[in-house]
Amino acid sequence: MRLFPVRFSAASSSMASLAKMLDFYSGFNPSPLSIKQFMDFGQNACEKKSYIFLRKELPVRLANIMKEIALLPDNLLHTRSVSEVSSWYVKSFEDVLVYEKAEPTHDNLQKFVADLDLIRNRHNDVVQTMAQGVIEMKENEGGQVDAPTESSIQYFLDRLYMSRISIRMLINQHTLLFGGNPHAGGRHIGCLDPACDLSDVVRDAYENARFLCDQYYLTSPALEIQQHSSEPGDNLPIRTVYVPSHLYYMLFELFKNSMRAVVEHHGHDNNDTLPPLKVAICKGKEDICVKISDQGGGIPRSQTDQLFKYMYSTAPQPSKSDLHTVPLAGYGYGLPISRLYARYFHGDIVLLSCEGFGTDAIIYLKALSDEANELLPIFNKTSSKFYRATVPTGDWSNQVKYAKKKKTSAVNQ
């Protein structure tokens, strides 16, 4: 097999052993958990049970995505930044394997929590560093990336970042429940809020996005919130079991986009004349929807899908010196990663836009916690084939592009 382009400090026998363990653990599928399972375990938390589960599950999730890293196109895999990310995954995989057969003694349990903290911190900059790797690849290729390579990168980054979200979820739950600073007396179960007030998270995300908007544009649109429930007896505000930080990330990104669109579309008018952002929080039997509606001029339908692509950004690329001061600035990763957060527990983000008027962004969440299961990437023959596949030739006419290339039509003839 092809190992990552990283330098191992251990001998070649250790490299062979690592490859063997990668093959072993990547042969298992990850075990997705539901929000209900996270809650049930957290309410009756047993550190030894969590330790025994994680010492097997974390290597499986790491190995599955590490196998896919090795399948990346060579011109991306061998960039400095991607090599660095690869080395982080190798080190974390080795760190977790230390506990493969270690008994859950008090000392081992304490050391396990400390090592999980180190692993989480080690991977803090995965998103930014991978983005820098893509930039390096594009620069090395003269700014041109062929369609098959772009398709492979889009496919891989969705899976890498979803895997990262899931691994951080497992680590955060364990360290919050059994670390040195648990939420003593709070209602949170690890990073889950069993009664998450959606309108509170909406207001929090709005206020922080508004602060940035006011700083840059000296004005910002107001906020209006409405709440609706399909059950007449439901109390308002609408609450659900969720990870508030995940929802906040999605809302903050969407609010930033909407505020910028509104202010720029309406010519930096005063707050009183800017149309407000309207948020509708709706609870049904199957879905909970949070809809943000703006009057920011909308997006052409041809560009909507592009907004979720990692290789597409309308903003200038950041310099390396800005990498840590302005997280994700210029990479255009906010929307695609927001959608991954929504999809992680089988929700989604959908954009509906009317060009010339405005855009509706809808966050879908599962209303029932036992249906909110993790969506996890699995390494298998299907996924490995994707990296070697070419983009299929279109078998439908594309009238828009066709008209641009060939003005004379059968009708005109």
UniProtKB/Swiss-Prot annotation:
EC category: transferase
Keyword Transmembrane assigned: no
UniProt cross-references to InterPro entries, sorted A to Z: AK/P_DHK_N_sf, BCDHK/PDK_N, BCKD/PDK, HATPase_C_sf, His_kinase_dom
SUPFAM superfamilies referenced in this protein's UniProt entry, alphabetically: alpha-ketoacid dehydrogenase kinase, N-terminal domain (SSF69012), ATPase domain of HSP90 chaperone/DNA topoisomerase II/histidine kinase (SSF55874)
The reaction(s) this protein catalyses: L-seryl-[pyruvate dehydrogenase E1 alpha subunit] + ATP = O-phospho-L-seryl-[pyruvate dehydrogenase E1 alpha subunit] + ADP + H(+)
Annotated family: Belongs to the PDK/BCKDK protein kinase family.
PANTHER family named among the record's database cross-references: [PYRUVATE DEHYDROGENASE (ACETYL-TRANSFERRING)] KINASE, MITOCHONDRIAL, PYRUVATE DEHYDROGENASE KINASE
Name under which the protein is recorded: [Pyruvate dehydrogenase (acetyl-transferring)] kinase, mitochondrial
Source species: Drosophila melanogaster (Fruit fly)
